[in-house]
């Protein structure tokens, strides 16, 4: 659904300022929740605002932030969306049921009744580039709208190291063993409350694939010059594929 009030300009997006909203929203300064600062520009969360005479602004879906410009506002928008979801899900204490409040010092929700403290939800997940010489394993998801090739990926389980997550996900999804697990880089992915961590690893043994058809529609080995991929500014998966294709890893 629609979620964020935006102004769309020829050169990108913009958010409303307090001066745009204050005439129609008398308590906006008391109700605004500070989110974060980017290059000395402060961002706040304001809900249930009146926008009767704000014809230049529209309510937009979170997907608008995938390709919006400038990138720092797109990042601010989707990160604010993630925090808004977390605040909505933490209005009341899960331990005693009393109302929670924003802590004055930390990004945290606090229950004054029982002392419970809740921090933002961040789910660790891995993206895995399984390689075998000059070949990389690429897959397509089963039953999802996204139909392009991707790398293997999955969430970390409780009690598991990140390296164990890599080994388990590869075994579960394609039935292969891997070795020489190497960290590449990370990326926050606020669309799903996730912190993505990219790894490359080498095939350990035979390359015959045993596909988990509930998770994947297919999985194939591609040589560097055969890899089907196009540049994408916001995808760690895409970046890892291109790095391998160009012989940089």
Where are these regions (language model features)?
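Nudix hydrolase/Nudix homology domain
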Residues: 1-90, 145-149, 191, 212-249
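Cys/His-rich short segments
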Residues: 79-131
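Short glycine/proline-enriched turns and hinge-like loops at secondary-structure junctions
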Residues: 105, 122-123, 150, 193-194, ...
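N-terminal strand-loop-strand
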Residues: 108-151, 155, 177-178, 201-203
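The catalytic Nudix box helix
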Residues: 150-185, 199, 203
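Active-site-adjacent beta-strand/loop module that shapes the phosphate/pyrophosphate-binding cleft
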Residues: 187-210
